[in-house]
Amino acid sequence: METFLFTSESVNEGHPDKLCDQISDAVLDACLEQDPDSKVACETCTKTNMVMVFGEITTKATVDYEKIVRDTCRAIGFVSDDVGLDADKCKVLVNIEQQSPDIAQGVHGHFTKCPEEIGAGDQGHMFGYATDETPELMPLSHVLATKLGARLTEVRKNGTCAWLRPDGKTQVTVEYYNDKGAMVPIRVHTVLISTQHDETVTNDEIARDLKEHVIKPVIPEKYLDEKTIFHLNPSGRFVIGGPHGDAGLTGRKIIIDTYGGWGAHGGGAFSGKDPTKVDRSGAYIVRQAAKSVVANGMARRALVQVSYAIGVPEPLSVFVDTYETGLIPDKEILKIVKESFDFRPGMMTINLDLKRGGNGRFLKTAAYGHFGRDDPDFTWEVVKPLKWDKPQA
């Protein structure tokens, strides 16, 4: 049996880029909670002792940007300079302007009240992917890397591994078998964890705790064997982290946010963007489409692409590829997808309830992945029943 290796990575909520994603989405939540028609394009950057929020926001909401920044940093665990940032003492800079009126009139059709006529917020192409290799219909390499990162945060915050600090990265290499286009995971080949830690802990303690409290609870035993390779803090020291260690910027972890390198990516980031930005809403609807194709048994694996022009409601193109795993031809699946999903931005917003912010709805998406999550707020993960005629055996 011929196999191959595929690797996916993830980063923790304390990684500087992910900190920025979370602040941008916390701002989005605050705007949408008070004004569901808010137009938000919020970027964040950070470096030692500084966080800056900037972009274009048109909203009726009253938003305390500085408070959102400090609250988000504090919730992650950035409470002193020695962990990488002090939420209460860092400088917070804000440079927010209103959305360009040129964009507004093109996108909103001179502020039409008709959702069917709302144009795309920009040009671009987005991809959705699904695979039957996990219950989440997500790639195993990505699922494991993401869950390891989430588990690191859990054992830090609950005190199981008190030596942990907020920043960290994970990476998982899985050995796969290609079963006529479908991906079948055989085993975990390599596990890599690099996590920020305090001065007091030894490398041996780090390795022992990571294996016992992070890897064991996350990676199913059937995927681990005596040949599995573990690289646990291989650099030997990771005390300086967070924005003190590296600059951070919104939108730099787009593969971690999606499918861990599987499928494809159109290049647009998600965080800090309201649903008129098809970078986000378009990617959400094609995930729902791809997941529904696989969940309905039409194929074992599916990729769906959609593309847009700024100001135009109808998509320019919709594409489906089942990697030759479809029980019916891809062109028939494409027809079903186009009949079953409304790809117009105004209708995607309604059908996926994307104007509803608050309660950390979009903040939750900004760490540990936008897809494959079992959470009612992730409306794009709901499988849609599709009508199709299964061929006779």
From Swiss-Prot:
<dbReference type="Pfam" id="PF00438">
    <property type="entry name" value="S-AdoMet_synt_N"/>
</dbReference>
<comment type="pathway">
    <text>Amino-acid biosynthesis; S-adenosyl-L-methionine biosynthesis; S-adenosyl-L-methionine from L-methionine: step 1/1.</text>
</comment>
<feature type="binding site" description="in other chain">
    <location>
        <position position="56"/>
    </location>
    <ligand>
        <name>L-methionine</name>
    </ligand>
</feature>
<keyword id="KW-0067">ATP-binding</keyword>
<comment type="subunit">
    <text>Homotetramer. Interacts with GRF3.</text>
</comment>
<feature type="binding site">
    <location>
        <position position="246"/>
    </location>
    <ligand>
        <name>L-methionine</name>
    </ligand>
</feature>
<feature type="binding site">
    <location>
        <position position="269"/>
    </location>
    <ligand>
        <name>ATP</name>
    </ligand>
</feature>
<feature type="binding site" description="in other chain">
    <location>
        <begin position="235"/>
        <end position="238"/>
    </location>
    <ligand>
        <name>ATP</name>
    </ligand>
</feature>
<dbReference type="GO" id="GO:0046872">
    <property type="term" value="F:metal ion binding"/>
</dbReference>
<protein>
    <recommendedName>
        <fullName>S-adenosylmethionine synthase 1</fullName>
        <ecNumber>2.5.1.6</ecNumber>
    </recommendedName>
</protein>
<keyword id="KW-0808">Transferase</keyword>
<feature type="binding site" description="in other chain">
    <location>
        <begin position="252"/>
        <end position="253"/>
    </location>
    <ligand>
        <name>ATP</name>
    </ligand>
</feature>
<feature type="binding site">
    <location>
        <position position="43"/>
    </location>
    <ligand>
        <name>K(+)</name>
    </ligand>
</feature>
<feature type="binding site">
    <location>
        <position position="9"/>
    </location>
    <ligand>
        <name>Mg(2+)</name>
    </ligand>
</feature>
<keyword id="KW-0554">One-carbon metabolism</keyword>
<feature type="modified residue" description="S-nitrosocysteine">
    <location>
        <position position="114"/>
    </location>
</feature>
<dbReference type="InterPro" id="IPR022630">
    <property type="entry name" value="S-AdoMet_synt_C"/>
</dbReference>
<comment type="similarity">
    <text>Belongs to the AdoMet synthase family.</text>
</comment>
<dbReference type="GO" id="GO:0009505">
    <property type="term" value="C:plant-type cell wall"/>
</dbReference>
<dbReference type="GO" id="GO:0005576">
    <property type="term" value="C:extracellular region"/>
</dbReference>
<keyword id="KW-0547">Nucleotide-binding</keyword>
<dbReference type="Pfam" id="PF02772">
    <property type="entry name" value="S-AdoMet_synt_M"/>
</dbReference>
<dbReference type="InterPro" id="IPR002133">
    <property type="entry name" value="S-AdoMet_synthetase"/>
</dbReference>
<feature type="binding site">
    <location>
        <position position="273"/>
    </location>
    <ligand>
        <name>ATP</name>
    </ligand>
</feature>
<feature type="binding site" description="in other chain">
    <location>
        <position position="99"/>
    </location>
    <ligand>
        <name>L-methionine</name>
    </ligand>
</feature>
<dbReference type="GO" id="GO:0004478">
    <property type="term" value="F:methionine adenosyltransferase activity"/>
</dbReference>
<dbReference type="InterPro" id="IPR022628">
    <property type="entry name" value="S-AdoMet_synt_N"/>
</dbReference>
<feature type="binding site" description="in other chain">
    <location>
        <position position="246"/>
    </location>
    <ligand>
        <name>ATP</name>
    </ligand>
</feature>
<feature type="binding site">
    <location>
        <position position="277"/>
    </location>
    <ligand>
        <name>ATP</name>
    </ligand>
</feature>
<dbReference type="GO" id="GO:0005524">
    <property type="term" value="F:ATP binding"/>
</dbReference>
<dbReference type="GO" id="GO:0009693">
    <property type="term" value="P:ethylene biosynthetic process"/>
</dbReference>
<comment type="function">
    <text>Catalyzes the formation of S-adenosylmethionine from methionine and ATP. The reaction comprises two steps that are both catalyzed by the same enzyme: formation of S-adenosylmethionine (AdoMet) and triphosphate, and subsequent hydrolysis of the triphosphate.</text>
</comment>
<dbReference type="GO" id="GO:0006730">
    <property type="term" value="P:one-carbon metabolic process"/>
</dbReference>
<dbReference type="GO" id="GO:0006556">
    <property type="term" value="P:S-adenosylmethionine biosynthetic process"/>
</dbReference>
<feature type="binding site" description="in other chain">
    <location>
        <position position="15"/>
    </location>
    <ligand>
        <name>ATP</name>
    </ligand>
</feature>
<keyword id="KW-0963">Cytoplasm</keyword>
<keyword id="KW-0460">Magnesium</keyword>
<dbReference type="InterPro" id="IPR022631">
    <property type="entry name" value="ADOMET_SYNTHASE_CS"/>
</dbReference>
<keyword id="KW-0170">Cobalt</keyword>
<dbReference type="InterPro" id="IPR022636">
    <property type="entry name" value="S-AdoMet_synthetase_sfam"/>
</dbReference>
<feature type="binding site" description="in other chain">
    <location>
        <begin position="167"/>
        <end position="169"/>
    </location>
    <ligand>
        <name>ATP</name>
    </ligand>
</feature>
<dbReference type="Pfam" id="PF02773">
    <property type="entry name" value="S-AdoMet_synt_C"/>
</dbReference>
